[in-house]
Amino acid sequence: MAREGEGGGRGGREERDSEFVDRLVHINRVAKVVKGGRRFGFAALVVVGDQKGRVGYGHGKAREVPEAIRKATESAKRALIRVPLREGRTLHHDVNGRHGAGRVVLRAAPAGTGIIAGGPMRAVFETLGMHDVVAKSQGSSNPYNMIRATFDALQREDSPRAVAARRSLKVSVLQGRRLGGDTETAAEG
């Protein structure tokens, strides 16, 4: 008999975890040199998201591939960030990010554009729940640097509400400026 308020034991945890979608971005065979030779293991890079604006990435190492993926997934779930999305489908504004020699440019796109992104960035946008974005990667094509540069860019993304609060403005005034309809200059022109 399941106790009330605990989600039915282990089943409650499984239901909570099922809200996340994970994508394996990269798997790498690594070697540790020891006295008797080399010990081989695996390193996994995983991206996890809820497809509603939260996403995280994690890195896990183990002697077997499934264990490395499990560790990376747990690490990603502990490192989730929230990204504000416009209309639940794209970015509010264009943004750049960098990590090491990896640079990425993320651009907001009109509805119906789809995810135009290469390699590891596509996994980030799919797990984030973004439907329309144009992304370009420059410099390093190392998946670790591309993921970190993408997350750097996503953390720079601000919603109009956050920008308005920072500037002590109303959101409607800020939106009017974005659309080019400042009321005072429109009356003069």
Swiss-Prot record:
The keyword Protease does not apply. It comes from the Bacteria. InterPro entries: Ribosomal_Su5_D2-typ_SF (IPR020568), Ribosomal_uS5 (IPR000851), Ribosomal_uS5_bac-type (IPR005712), Ribosomal_uS5_C (IPR005324), Ribosomal_uS5_N (IPR013810), Ribosomal_uS5_N_CS (IPR018192), Ribsml_uS5_D2-typ_fold_subgr (IPR014721). Keywords: Ribonucleoprotein, Ribosomal protein, RNA-binding, rRNA-binding. The keyword RNA-binding applies. Residues 20-83 form the S5 DRBM domain. GO terms for biological process: translation. GO terms for molecular function: rRNA binding; structural constituent of ribosome. GO terms for cellular component: small ribosomal subunit. Transmembrane segments: none annotated. Belongs to the universal ribosomal protein uS5 family. The N-terminal domain interacts with the head of the 30S subunit; the C-terminal domain interacts with the body and contacts protein S4. The interaction surface between S4 and S5 is involved in control of translational fidelity. With S4 and S12 plays an important role in translational accuracy. Part of the 30S ribosomal subunit. Contacts proteins S4 and S8. This is Small ribosomal subunit protein uS5. It comes from Beijerinckia indica subsp. indica (strain ATCC 9039 / DSM 1715 / NCIMB 8712).
